[in-house]
């Protein structure tokens, strides 16, 4: 099984797929972003029926550092 993305938003002609990762600090956030991107690609998230005209796939990392506590890394896949 390929699994499922963390969040999928469907509109009339668009599907937006999110894969979220949690990082303890900025250094780990960079690594987690790479993991999320790879996971979206290898598991082919978003390519399900019914097909939509546009597929947007986003990898995002939440940095849990107490001084940051925000999504700091994003990438369109």
Regions found by a protein language model. Give the residues of each.
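Structural signature of nuclease core domains in nucleic-acid processing machines
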Residues: 1-77
